[in-house]
């Protein structure tokens, strides 16, 4: 099994998979008579059908034991999905490019600094939310509508990956 290298989350590195939601380097301007800075259009909500709705939820995630064997990725073919950390804690992100099935050789891992969220583009393969803390909360913006919006792919055993935030130096 290949151990994924965990990369810092940057806009350029993550661009093939979606948007990094952060204030650094974002368009911004003052509103509310100069009392509020608006960081504008950090990501776009993508829904496939005209009757779909963008919805906001909160996910409360529990940590998984590490190192973690990555045996499954999911995708949302009908809309984008954004995760914004509410408690300021770093979290892990595992993604693979859009395609009929994810390719383990093209799968990448990132770590958010806790002030960054992500917006997965429609159809991007990703692991369900991976918190580093014992429990963490995320604001989630995604799609509600008819039709299936979650495909899961299970890797063959020889294609599985390992995510280890604390690899031993050898």
UniProtKB/Swiss-Prot annotation:
Pathway annotation? Nitrogen metabolism; (S)-allantoin degradation
The protein's Enzyme Commission number: 4.3.2.3
If you read the UniProt record, what top EC class would you report for this enzyme, in one word? lyase
Reactions catalysed, semicolon-separated, are: (S)-ureidoglycolate = urea + glyoxylate
Pfam families on file: Ureidogly_lyase
**Which residue windows are coiled coil?**
none
Q: Which cofactor does it need?
A: Ni(2+)
Reply yes or no: does the keyword Lyase apply: yes
Q: Which UniProt keywords apply?
A: Lyase, Purine metabolism
Question: GO MF annotations for this entry?
Answer: ureidoglycolate hydrolase activity; ureidoglycolate lyase activity
List, in alphabetical order, the GO biological process terms annotated in this UniProt record: allantoin catabolic process; purine nucleobase catabolic process
Protein family: Belongs to the ureidoglycolate lyase family.
Quaternary context: Homodimer.
Q: What does this protein do?
A: Catalyzes the catabolism of the allantoin degradation intermediate (S)-ureidoglycolate, generating urea and glyoxylate. Involved in the utilization of allantoin as nitrogen source.
Descriptive protein name: Ureidoglycolate lyase
Q: What organism is recorded for this protein?
A: Pseudomonas syringae pv. tomato (strain ATCC BAA-871 / DC3000)
């Amino acid at each position: 099994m290949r151990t994924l290298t965990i990369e810092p989350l940057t806009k350029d590195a993550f661009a093939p998979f979606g948007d990094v939601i952060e204030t650094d380097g974002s368009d911004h301007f003052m509103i509310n008579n100069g009392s509020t800075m608006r960081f504008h259009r950090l990501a776009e909500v993508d829904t496939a059908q005209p009757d779909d709705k963008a919805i906001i939820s909160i996910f409360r995630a529990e940590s998984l034991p590490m190192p973690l064997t990555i045996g499954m990725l999911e995708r949302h073919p009908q809309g984008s999905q954004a995760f914004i950390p509410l408690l300021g804690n770093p979290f892990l992100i595992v993604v693979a490019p859009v395609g009929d099935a994810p390719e383990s050789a093209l799968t990448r891992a990132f770590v958010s600094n806790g002030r960054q969220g992500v917006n997965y583009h429609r159809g991007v393969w990703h692991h369900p939310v991976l918190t580093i803390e014992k429990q963490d909360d995320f604001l989630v913006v995604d799609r509600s509508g008819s039709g299936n919006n979650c495909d899961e792919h299970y890797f063959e055993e020889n294609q599985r990956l390992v995510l280890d935030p604390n690899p031993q130096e050898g």
